C-alpha cells in the first residue's frame, strides 16, 4: 500500500543501501575481467559452478563507467529515476474512478477496475473500459514526465557505458542474447497472421463489426 508512510520510508532506506553496493560491483567486475572468467573457473569447483555469473561480470566490465562514476550514478539514482518510478507507481496505485456498473455507480481503485476486464458480463467490461478512459488522462502529465525522465536518464547512462543501442543494454540486463531475442522476434512475426485471424473470429463471435472491441479482448 503506497499510502503507508512507514513502508515508503523503509523502501527509501533500502534504496540507499542498494546504492552503496553499485561501486563495489563495479570493482568486482573489473577484478574478474582483469583475471579472465575462464581462467578463474580453474581455481576451484565452486568457481567453475559459478562461471555464468563470472562471465556476466566480465561483460559488465566492458560496459561500465569508473567505480567512482558508478557510485555517483547509483546515489543520484535514488532521487532520479528511482524517485520518478516511485512517483509514477504511487500516482497510478492511488488512482480511483467512478464506474457506472449495471448495479449502480461505484468508486473503485484503478487496479480493481482493470480486474473487471475479464468479467463475464459485457456491460461490466464496457463500463470498466469507459471508466479507465476517463481516469488515465487525469494523471497523464505526471506519468509522461516520469517515464520521459526515466528513459532520458537510461539513454544518457547507456551512452556513457558505451552501449551501441538501448536494446543491447536491455538484453544484457535481462540475460538475453541477441540471437535469442532475434529468434523470439521472428517467432512473433511469423505468428501474427494467425493471431490476427483469431482476433477477427473473436470479433465476429462478439458481434463487433469494426474490429474487436477492447472490452471483448480478454
Each predicted region: which residue ranges?
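A well-structured
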Residues: 1-218
Amino acid at each position: 500500500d503506497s499510502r503507508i508512510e512507514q513502508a515508503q520510508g523503509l523502501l527509501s532506506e533500502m534504496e540507499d543501501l542498494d546504492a552503496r553496493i553499485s561501486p563495489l560491483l563495479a570493482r568486482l567486475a573489473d577484478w574478474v575481467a582483469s583475471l579472465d572468467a575462464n581462467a578463474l573457473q580453474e581455481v576451484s569447483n565452486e568457481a567453475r559452478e559459478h562461471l555464468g555469473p563470472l562471465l556476466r561480470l566480465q561483460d559488465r566490465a566492458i560496459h561500465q563507467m569508473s567505480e567512482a562514476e558508478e557510485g555517483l550514478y547509483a546515489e543520484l539514482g535514488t532521487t532520479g529515476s528511482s524517485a520518478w518510478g516511485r512517483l509514477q507507481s504511487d500516482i497510478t496505485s492511488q488512482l480511483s474512478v467512478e464506474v457506472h456498473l449495471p448495479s449502480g455507480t461505484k468508486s473503485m481503485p484503478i487496479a480493481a477496475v482493470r480486474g473487471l476486464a475479464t468479467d463475464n458480463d459485457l456491460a461490466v467490461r464496457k463500463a470498466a473500459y469507459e471508466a479507465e478512459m476517463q481516469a488515465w488522462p487525469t494523471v497523464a502529465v505526471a506519468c509522461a514526465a516520469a517515464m520521459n525522465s526515466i528513459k532520458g536518464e537510461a539513454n544518457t547512462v547507456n551512452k556513457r557505458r558505451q552501449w551501441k543501442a538501448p536494446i543491447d543494454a536491455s538484453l544484457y540486463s535481462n540475460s538475453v542474447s541477441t540471437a535469442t531475442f532475434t529468434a523470439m522476434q521472428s517467432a512473433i512475426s511469423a505468428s501474427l497472421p494467425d493471431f490476427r485471424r483469431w482476433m477477427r473470429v473473436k470479433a465476429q463471435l462478439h458481434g463487433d463489426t469494426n474490429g474487436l472491441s477492447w472490452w471483448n479482448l480478454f
